[in-house]
């Protein structure tokens, strides 16, 4: 009985996300206000839980979080559109800690085309 209880407790501990992971996901880490940035994509990592772009903006590197694969696809955004060397304009919520230089995208623009990832946010 004790072994089963210990196994259950350990399994739950492994399955539960860390405080850092919980704090990072969602919008609680952002300012709640929008910021617009334009820059050049330097690095791309797409996939779950969400895509990450490294974008050079006015000589500074920003971490830009795009949506989950299903959200990007729903907005009409194809993975191949987000590539190194592509100029991108993003509107979204920056990290409350501005020194983090991280932004969660609500809308992004590639050329003249707009992709709305979070239509219920402004």
Language model region names:
Residues 21-35:
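Short boundary/loop segments of OB/S1/cold-shock single-stranded nucleic-acid-binding domains
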Residues 39-41:
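Conserved hydrophobic positions within beta-strands
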Residues 47-56:
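Short aromatic-glycine-enriched beta-strand elements
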Residues 60-69:
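A short macromolecule-binding patch
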Residues 74-90:
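Short nucleic-acid-contacting surface segments enriched for D/E, G, S/T with interspersed K/R
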Residues 95-119:
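OB-fold/S1-family single-stranded nucleic acid-binding modules
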